[in-house]
């Protein structure tokens, strides 16, 4: 009898595959919209911390209304620095404003997809987006991928570039460093290829080191057979 595939084990939900959220600093979201829709709130950066669950550092900010929030730290943010959230906030690093109030050509990050959702786009270390143009009912933003996306002018974003850039410039060099990199987030690593497994572990397994059968499979295949190119229209190079 064969053994369960990795994706079958993952679907069971055992601790091996669960995210260790108890190690993470917490959710990073903007202050609810009803607090900052008509007024600007001042906050002070109390601490900048490493977050194992992110590629960027986070900052703990205490606001004048008594709320404490975690924000994604931009490059150049300092402990003790004052930041502002609201429609009248100055266009300076670390401040959060509606897209309608941000000039064209400004670097921004942590952009809301829908007004009030707390920030969804451009949150990884070293990333930034660019305000390209604006129209009456939308603002065009260039995302890190180069895609131009239209946002509601009331969506909020933070001025600056996310800290933590250059993280991938230093090579890992050895497998031991990769081990600790993945262990921090409880990632299943290493992940062997199916053709390198024994026949009992994978449909492509065995000692031939090639699949030995077509790599395309049906969308309706049973879980233990659903590997390879699932419901593929074509495989290989385009002709």
From Swiss-Prot:
Stretches for region Disordered: 1-20, 203-239
Superkingdom field: Archaea
InterPro entries: NA-bd_OB-fold (IPR012340), Rib_uL2_dom2 (IPR014722), Ribosomal_uL2 (IPR002171), Ribosomal_uL2_arc_euk (IPR023672), Ribosomal_uL2_C (IPR022669), Ribosomal_uL2_dom3 (IPR014726), Ribosomal_uL2_RNA-bd_dom (IPR022666), Translation_prot_SH3-like_sf (IPR008991)
SUPFAM superfamilies: Nucleic acid-binding proteins (SSF50249), Translation proteins SH3-like domain (SSF50104)
GO molecular function: rRNA binding; structural constituent of ribosome
Assigned keywords, A-Z: Ribonucleoprotein, Ribosomal protein, RNA-binding, rRNA-binding
Keyword check for Ribonucleoprotein: yes
Listed Basic residues bias regions: 222-239
Record-level GO BP terms: cytoplasmic translation
Signal peptide range in chain numbering: none
A GO cellular-component term linked to this record: cytosolic large ribosomal subunit
Record flagged with keyword RNA-binding: yes
Pfam families associated with the record: Ribosomal_L2, Ribosomal_L2_C
Family in the record: Belongs to the universal ribosomal protein uL2 family.
Job of this protein: One of the primary rRNA binding proteins. Required for association of the 30S and 50S subunits to form the 70S ribosome, for tRNA binding and peptide bond formation. It has been suggested to have peptidyltransferase activity; this is somewhat controversial. Makes several contacts with the 16S rRNA in the 70S ribosome.
Subunit structure: Part of the 50S ribosomal subunit. Forms a bridge to the 30S subunit in the 70S ribosome.
Stored NCBIfam families: PRK09612.1 (NF007180)
Name of the protein described by the UniProt record: Large ribosomal subunit protein uL2
Species assigned in the record: Pyrococcus horikoshii (strain ATCC 700860 / DSM 12428 / JCM 9974 / NBRC 100139 / OT-3)
């Amino acid at each position: 009898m064969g053994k369960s595939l990795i994706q079958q084990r993952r679907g069971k939900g055992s601790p091996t595959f669960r995210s260790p959220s108890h190690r993470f600093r917490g959710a990073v979201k903007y202050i609810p919209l009803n607090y900052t829709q008509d007024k600007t709130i001042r906050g002070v950066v109390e601490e900048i911390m490493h977050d194992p669950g992110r590629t960027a550092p986070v900052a703990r900010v205490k606001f004048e209304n008594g709320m404490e929030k975690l924000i994604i730290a931009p490059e150049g943010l300092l402990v003790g620095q004052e930041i502002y959230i609201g429609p009248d906030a100055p266009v300076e690093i670390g401040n959060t404003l509606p897209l309608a109030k941000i000039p064209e050509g400004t670097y921004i990050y942590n952009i809301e997809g829908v007004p009030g959702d707390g920030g969804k786009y451009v949150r990884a270390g070293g990333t930034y987006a660019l305000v390209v143009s604006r129209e009456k009912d939308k603002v065009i933003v260039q995302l890190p991928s180069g895609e131009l996306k239209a946002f509601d002018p009331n969506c909020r974003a933070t001025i600056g570039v996310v800290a933590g850039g250059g993280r991938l410039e230093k090579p890992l060099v050895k497998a031991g460093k990769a081990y600790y990199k993945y262990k921090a987030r409880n990632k299943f690593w290493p992940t062997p290829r199916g053709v390198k497994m024994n026949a009992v572990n994978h449909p492509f397994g065995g000692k031939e080191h090639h699949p030995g059968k077509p790599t395309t499979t049906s969308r309706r295949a049973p879980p233990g057979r659903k590997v390879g190119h699932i419901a593929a229209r074509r495989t290989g190079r385009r002709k």
